[in-house]
């Protein structure tokens, strides 16, 4: 038993887990969790609180697993917790791969560099697409390492699982991971001159790459197609999926001017500039013009006005890079380190290996354009790509060709070499920490509408409907938004709804209110509207579509808290 324990403590698995768990604990101890994008908050809200697993961003299987475990882990937001644990597992997998190929000493250095550059963002700023990029990086490296060792045991299957979970969180990054997987194969084949082998020997070299590639593609695409099928299984889920896709497309681009396209917008039911303003703000009304058909029309107009050509993104990437240089953020530091690693790579490797960095850089540039094109946005197009470039470059090091005297010289364990390495790592760590804390945006607690929250909680018999623009600010100061890891209480937002697409239908039914939120606001009892903006446009809309000849619908001020006004809405004769 003692020998087994000692062997376990000396194993590469324990080495990888121990390092990355310690790093995770340190970062969590000195930082605070926050959402990098409000999208992940809404994903966690719908999955963990409302148990609505139909989503165009998150795979249905992952949503179901997360939502089911939420019934057990009540004190945690499982969607966020899983991203933290999966990030730690992915970093550990990358460390394991490095330790297996290069030994623990080099793996330790490589791991510290990767964690210094990327772990702050993964553990403090929650974003599913970044977690997906890390999972896919780790998964494909585990698969490549299994091919190198010709052993398809537990580490290989863990890598496959990481690829699967990466596709669950962001399927668009799946193809980026595949591109780097193929790039490594091509580079390895050329560097080792395998293409000169006779066909039979080349086939035995080529076969495992093809089989692993085909297997991963079939599994990844198959599970994504299953999620797509479930999301489109019936009219209700299909409409939700369609709305989510269109809403993402339109939100990522500037809305067209109503005056320039009023004829097209009139054809889908938006009959005035005021209605269009409500539509842009996020109001949704299936019975009238503020619906999915209008979203589709606006998306078409946006596509015509701003044709999103794949190759046009190249110039935009340079402008993004210039922005990172000016801001001196973590992207710039990561890019500088990548250049340094590539210089070391070219210096250490033979000429036939030295083209690897250029190959990865070219694929990374194309991948950035693809991600920007696929996501219709410039946000986070470089983060996952930089992670993959440096990880695959590190894995591509090959010290086997060095002579014994050269190898001893490179791996010299003298105090001078160790001291220089420590100084470089400390400087890199300090610079990255300063950049991180300099760019962090603290929560403005003085703007938190605490009095409004208290008023809403004190009156559970009332039902409050939020204006969509007001809702964004209202939500952003709730405890669950400020503290992403906290589990949702059973009464979180239980008497709060909105004018957007999704509604608390069960709450409306239980309160004997119409499931049409506009009818519920006008004719329901104890229903109030919370709005920070001017209301006359909303009054005009309600009078036009829900008014009666013998009365007028008006907003009446009831109370005001922290700049938010609570209105009662009713008919006045």
Question: Where on the chain are the PLM-derived regions?
Answer:
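Transmembrane-helix motifs of polytopic, lipid-linked glycan transferases
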Residues: 85-104, 339-347
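Membrane-interface transmembrane helices that cradle and orient dolichyl/undecaprenyl
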Residues: 139-155
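Membrane-interface alpha helices of multi-pass inner-membrane proteins
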Residues: 154-173, 181-182, 212-219
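Signature aromatic-anchored transmembrane alpha helix within multi-pass, membrane-resident enzymes
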Residues: 156, 206-215, 401-434
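Extracytoplasmic loop-helix module adjacent to an early transmembrane segment
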Residues: 16-56, 67
């Amino acid at each position: 038993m003692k020998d087994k324990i000692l062997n376990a403590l000396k194993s590469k698995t324990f080495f990888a887990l121990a390092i990355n768990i310690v790093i995770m604990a340190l970062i969590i101890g000195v930082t605070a969790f926050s959402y990098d994008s409000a999208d992940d908050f809404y994903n966690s809200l719908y999955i963990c609180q409302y148990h609505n697993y139909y989503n165009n961003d998150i795979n249905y299987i992952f949503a179901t697993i997360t939502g089911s475990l939420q019934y057990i882990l009540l004190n945690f937001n499982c969607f966020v917790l899983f991203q933290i644990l999966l990030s730690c597992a992915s970093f550990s997998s990358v460390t394991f791969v490095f330790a297996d190929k290069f030994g623990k000493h080099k793996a330790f250095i490589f791991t510290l560099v990767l964690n210094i550059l990327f772990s702050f963002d993964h553990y403090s700023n929650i974003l599913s697409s970044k977690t997906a990029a890390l999972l896919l990086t780790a998964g494909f490296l585990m698969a490549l390492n299994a091919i190198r060792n010709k052993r398809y045991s537990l580490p290989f299957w863990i890598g496959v699982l990481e690829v699967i979970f990466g596709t669950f969180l962001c399927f668009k990054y799946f193809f980026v991971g595949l591109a780097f997987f193929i790039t490594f194969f091509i580079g390895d084949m050329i560097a080792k001159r395998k293409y000169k082998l006779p066909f039979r020997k080349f086939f035995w070299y080529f076969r495992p790459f093809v089989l692993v590639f085909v297997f991963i593609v079939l599994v990844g695409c198959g599970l994504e197609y299953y999620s797509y099928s479930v999301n489109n299984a019936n009219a209700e889920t299909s409409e939700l999926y369609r709305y989510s896709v269109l809403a993402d497309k339109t939100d990522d681009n500037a809305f067209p001017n109503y005056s320039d396209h009023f004829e097209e917008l009139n054809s889908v039911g938006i009959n005035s500039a005021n209605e269009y303003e409500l539509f842009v703000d996020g109001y949704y009304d299936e019975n009238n013009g503020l619906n999915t058909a209008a979203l589709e029309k606006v998306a078409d107009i946006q596509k015509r006005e701003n044709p999103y050509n794949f190759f046009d993104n190249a110039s935009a990437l340079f402008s993004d890079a210039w922005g990172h240089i000016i801001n001196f953020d973590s992207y710039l530091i990561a890019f500088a380190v990548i250049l340094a690693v590539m210089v070391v790579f070219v210096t250490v490797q033979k000429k036939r290996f030295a083209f690897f960095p250029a190959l990865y850089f070219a694929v990374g540039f194309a991948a950035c354009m693809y991600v920007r094109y696929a996501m219709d946005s410039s946000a986070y197009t470089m983060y996952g790509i930089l992670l993959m470039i440096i990880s695959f470059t590190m894995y591509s090091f090959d010290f086997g060709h060095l002579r014994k005297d050269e190898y001893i010289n490179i791996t010299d364990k003298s105090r001078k070499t160790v001291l220089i390495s420590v100084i470089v790592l400390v400087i890199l760590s300090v610079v990255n920490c300063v950049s991180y804390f300099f760019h962090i945006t603290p929560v403005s607690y003085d703007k938190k509408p605490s009095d409004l929250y208290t008023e809403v909680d004190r009156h559970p018999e009332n039902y409050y409907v939020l204006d969509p623009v007001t809702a964004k600010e209202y939500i952003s100061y709730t405890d669950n938004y400020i503290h992403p890891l906290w589990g949702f209480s059973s009464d979180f937002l239980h008497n709060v709804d909105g004018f957007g697409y999704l509604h608390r239908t069960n709450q409306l039914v239980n309160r004997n209110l119409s499931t049409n939120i506009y009818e519920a606001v006008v004719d329901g009892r104890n229903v109030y509207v919370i709005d920070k903006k001017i209301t006359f446009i909303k009054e005009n809309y309600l009078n036009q579509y829900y008014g009666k000849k013998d009365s007028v619908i008006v907003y009446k001020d009831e109370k005001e808290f922290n700049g938010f006004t609570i209105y009662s809405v009713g008919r006045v004769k």
